[in-house]
Amino acid sequence: GEKSIYSEKKKVKLYYTNKTGDKLISCFREVEVKNNVPLETQVLLMLKNPPASKKNLKSPLSQDFHVNQTQIMNNTCYVDLSSDIENAVADVKEKITVYAMVNTLTDLDTAYQVQFTIDGKRVSKLNEFEKFDTLLTSNFSLCK
C-alpha cells in the first residue's frame, strides 16, 4: 500500500539574530515533524523566516540558503550545505550565522556537536569564520 506521510507537532528553540546581526536571540516555534524530511533540515530552513510577530528578529541566513542533507551519527549532526551559505547576509557576522545553526541543532537533543560540509567537502573557512571544518558545539556567549 501507500506509505503515509506521518507528521506531529514539536516545539523547538530556534536562534535568530537581532537587527544589528551581532547577537543571537532564541525563540520557540512549533514545527510539524514529517517522516520524509529530517527535523534537523526543517529547523535549519525555518531560520530563514523569523516569526512575523517578532519585529526585533532577522534571519541569520541568506534567502537562497539550501540544505543538501542532514544526518545524525554518534551524537554528531552532519550538515551538508549548498555553496549558497557563502553568500554573506548583510550586516550579519559569520559567527552569528554559524552559531545560529549550531545552537538550533544542538538544542534538539539529537546531537551535541555539528560537522558542516559544503557540497560534500569540508571547508576550513566560511568567509570570516575560521575552523568551519571542525566539530562545533553550542556557543551561548553570543546570545542576547
Q: What are these model-derived regions, one by one?
A:
Residues 1-144:
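Bimodal "functional hotspot" detector
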